[in-house]
């Protein structure tokens, strides 16, 4: 089938439903597998310092394969690329189940995730366009956040019952995602017949980076989404240290519940963005980005649980409203210049590099003994200033 056959179809077409279901199951597996594998490391008496390595190998796969996965997504039908990527995740989860080194298995899942991301976002621009694309991004983000919430809880609960059951559930989720991918229409490849020389692919990826950076709109989107997701991961780790200091609560559950409030808020914000923001009015999302930093600053000063819950949900709402239009803008403009797959691959490189950089700065701040509350205040202030500077930069260019 040609690509044009499916363009501008209903937001709830068979293909779109299959994409959303596959995304939910795949993201559910990703989040459940993290907690299940952490439980496995504890059960097998791995040292505590080894636990962050799981996140590092996962993010590292995104960065390492960034020059190649965009071309993969654009050279084949994106639904089939998604199916192959989920198959890699299934293989990684199954290998952990069968006793293969968990770091190797999790690395394979990371490779699958790296290949999956450009295809899952790129296909939205092939199934729908224009104002529907923002709404489709909202559905994608909402399904992802729902999967994060349910997957994280399921991974932890099942691991407390039996680690092997938790790992098997993750493999089952990936298997379900593979099946869902079968129902995605086989669209024409966006850019077939490209060279598979690794040097040329790397050069082509760097050219895509340059092309997107030179375009004011895509540069604006890349910087904005990278700042957001880098800050989001840092906030997750900040909460782990902040809760016992600010609230005097030492259990492991409270930081998880607080993180869940952010995720719920993102769903609400994504829905609001789908209704209130179009590709022509993307700048409407910028005040929300600035307010994220302001609310993080206020949150860092709290000492009561209920205001903390409310402020974190507000951070999530602002975050969803901020990031969904930027994603849609990059997909639409990137599809026309370097291909949607390459655009998302460049975005992944930026976001994951920002994650590593921000986490590194945060870890250094903790290492030198800066108290967590001042870290939170500084983090919020710097984020607000960074988004304000980005907005001013975008308006001038």
Curated annotation (Swiss-Prot):
Coiled coil: none annotated. The keyword DNA-binding does not apply. It comes from Escherichia coli O17:K52:H18 (strain UMN026 / ExPEC). Keywords: Cell inner membrane, Cell membrane, Lipid transport, Membrane, Transmembrane, Transmembrane helix, Transport. One of its GO terms (molecular function) is lysophospholipid:sodium symporter activity. This is Lysophospholipid transporter LplT. Belongs to the major facilitator superfamily. LplT (TC 2.A.1.42) family. The keyword Protein transport does not apply. Catalyzes the facilitated diffusion of 2-acyl-glycero-3-phosphoethanolamine (2-acyl-GPE) into the cell. HAMAP family: MFS_LplT (MF_01585). It is found in: Cell inner membrane.
